[in-house]
Curated annotation (Swiss-Prot):
The keyword Signal does not apply. This is Tetratricopeptide repeat protein 39A. The lineage of its organism: Eukaryota, Metazoa, Chordata, Craniata, Vertebrata. Disulfide bonds: none annotated. The gene is ttc39a. Belongs to the TTC39 family.
């Protein structure tokens, strides 16, 4: 190699080095998706201090592990590793400012552009870990600042790669994939948030375009680049989880299955894709098929046991939908013993399943529901300084059992099922709704035969709300509307479960949407949004109200909050 060609050789070496890094990281991700988790980390670790892509992907895999284990040591380790990855990326960035400070003729090298997108991604991941790691509001705000900075870099990157002057190096598809992931993630996520929550997160003035976000993520997921997996996982989470839990409950199972198909062919035993395939079957009401896929997901790998916990959670709900209370209890018990995510929730669900059994039926392992309900508050935990809303809800409901002669919760399993929008899940299979209606009618008969007490009105309204959902599933719209209205007119009589009224208004508005009464639906949604505050699971209800208003293309601004929020 002659001295006169040193400059071109150096530039070519840098490009080859970047390409070699990307190729090796793709191989590591391939191992990861084939359940070879430790081998994936072993391939990434040696270069994680010198290659921005090795550093980023290594830290990302550790982050995924930490979010599944929920072990504080794992979260701290992942956070420190992601911080180190950000420092590695910083070394490759342009020294004098970012993209926005470029002069007209001040071109960035391919390596420097890749460093920008990797740096933005590190910020995003660190923000997520910050929210999990610390228990004070200062850390929460720091996480919000990281998110905002990441957002601004992604916006600059998106504009930059769209410009005609952009140099398209040999690894440009990976750069585009990184930008698609960031822009898609922000647009989709921000579109889900009500305006007042965006304000709390320092995102006032920012908004998300849901359809644009989905299109960006879909492009990224189908482009066979380094970020394909992340784009696909985020879309699958949206299609099979977020659209149910924080949306109006339709789900987008056809899109999920279309996205899954090539990944299922490429990774037929990939535990992650078996899990999402199971979730798709669950949404369709094909419970037996879902159970088989979740069980296959558990059998597919034994290295990351914490991945099994995601399957156990879904198996618990599958058996709930079929009213196999003891089988559902079995998975709640496994979770309570093995998972760190929310022991209070798992113990509450164990107690709830036992309470659904006839008094004459034996209890597994000699457990007693009253004792279990009383244990629930002892397992309280905090994330970002606050207890998770579902855990707070479980603890509040379990308080009833502190009394020496407690008044039983009428249908605690079905109530929690509603919080996870499970009644939408069973709507596709009439026999599942019929079974739940039988359970509710039996609970209603028991309640009417019992002496009145301080919980009677609240328990009656809960049963009315859930009956309304079953009747709606069965196409009995007027009867369903009557049930929801019964809850609404009982508002002033409620003593404890004040969440029932805004949720009854939400469900009635969704019924109105289905029956073509758009204007009435909007009025009810605005009432649910503006007239109620400080009730259980408020954020989740507000997310669902926002989703319904967005669906109707109604005004989703806060209207200066002229009524109490």
């Amino acid at each position: 190699m002659s001295t006169g060609k040193n400059a071109p050789v150096t530039e070519n070496s840098r490009q080859m080095s970047l390409q070699a890094c990307l190729d090796e990281c793709m191989e590591a991700l391939d191992l990861f998706l084939n359940n070879h988790f430790n081998e994936s980390l072993d391939k990434l670790r040696p270069r994680s201090k010198e290659s921005m892509y090795h550093a980023l992907i290594y830290a990302t895999v550790l982050e995924m592990q930490a979010m599944m284990t929920f072990q504080q040591d794992d979260i701290v380790h992942a956070g420190n590793t992601m911080k180190s990855a950000q420092e590695v990326c910083q070394r490759f960035r342009k020294k004098s400012g970012g993209l926005g400070s470029r002069g007209a003729n001040d071109d960035l090298s391919e390596e420097q552009i890749h460093a920008e997108v990797c740096y933005a991604e590190c910020l995003l991941h660190r923000a997520a870990l910050t929210f999990l790691q610390d228990e004070n509001m200062v850390s929460f705000i720091k996480g919000g600042i990281k998110v905002r900075n990441s957002y601004l870099i992604y916006k600059e990157l998106h504009a930059f790669i769209q410009s005609d002057a952009t140099f398209k190096g040999p690894n440009h598809k990976h750069l585009e994939g990184g930008v698609s992931f960031g822009i898609g993630a922000f647009n989709l996520t921000l579109s889900l948030f009500p305006a007042r929550i965006l304000k709390l997160l320092e995102f006032a003035g920012f908004s998300g375009d849901k359809e644009f976000g989905i299109s960006q993520l879909y492009t990224g997921a189908t482009s066979h680049t380094l970020r394909s997996m992340l784009c696909a996982l985020l879309l699958l989470c949206f299609y099979t989880f977020l659209s149910f839990i924080l949306g109006t409950g339709e789900g987008e199972v056809e899109e999920a299955e279309r996205l899954l198909k090539p990944f299922r062919l490429r990774y037929p035993r990939g535990a992650i894709f078996l899990f999402f395939a199971g979730r798709a079957e669950e949404i369709k009401g094909n419970i037996d098929e879902a159970v088989a896929l979740f069980e296959d997901g558990c059998k597919a790998q034994q290295v990351w046991k914490q991945f099994h916990h995601m399957c156990y959670w879904e198996l618990m709900w599958c058996f709930t939908f079929k009213r196999y209370w003891k089988m559902a209890y079995f998975y709640a018990d496994l979770l309570s013993q093995e998972s760190r995510w929310s022991k209070a929730m798992y113990v509450y669900m164990k107690a709830a399943y036992l309470s659904m059994l006839p008094d004459s039926e034996s209890r597994p392992f000699g457990d007693n529901e009253v004792d279990l309900f009383r244990q629930v508050p002892t397992y309280k935990q905090k994330i970002a300084g606050k207890s998770p809303p579902t855990e707070k809800f479980a603890i509040r409901k379990a308080r009833r059992y502190k009394a020496s002669n407690p008044v039983r919760l009428p249908v605690p399993v079905l109530e929690m099922m509603y919080m996870w929008n499970g009644f939408s899940m069973i709507s596709k299979q009439p026999e599942l709704t019929e079974g739940m209606m039988e359970t509710l009618l039996e609970a209603e008969r028991t309640l009417r035969a019992s002496p009145d007490n301080e919980y009677t009105v609240d328990d009656t309204c809960l049963i009315q709300l859930l009956k309304g959902l079953c009747l709606k599933n069965q196409g009995q719209m007027q009867a369903a509307e009557d049930c929801f209205n019964q809850v609404y007119i009982s508002e002033k009589k409620l003593k404890f479960d004040h969440y029932l009224v805004p949720n009854a208004l939400l469900e009635m508005s969704l019924l109105f949407i289905d029956t073509g009464r758009k204007e009435q639906a909007i009025k009810l949604l605005q009432k649910a949004k503006n007239n109620y505050k400080v009730y259980s699971m408020e954020s989740r209800t507000q997310f669902r109200v926002h989703a319904a208003l967005t669906k109707l293309k109604a005004d989703v601004s806060d209207q200066e909050e002229i009524t109490a929020l």
